[in-house]
Amino acid sequence: GNPLDGETRSFMESRFGQDFSDIRVHHDQPAAEAASLIKAQAFTTGRDIYFGRGQLQPQTTAGQKLLAHELTHVVQQGNG
């Protein structure tokens, strides 16, 4: 996976009060297939967030909400 881009990371860190430097996002074909298998737009395991096809769109309001939702899982799982 790849780290969050700098602008997105800064935006989310300021709202969560968390360091997301080691979060990895996956939005390739295997990630899309895994999300599809569990009928999810995205899912989180540990500090890795997997996105369905076309779901990683942090430049949009809907994309920010989805990413924030997944980052909440990171924090809730004690990985934040």
Question: Where are the model-predicted features located?
Answer:
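Juxtamembrane/interface and other helix-to-disorder boundary residues
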Residues: 1-80
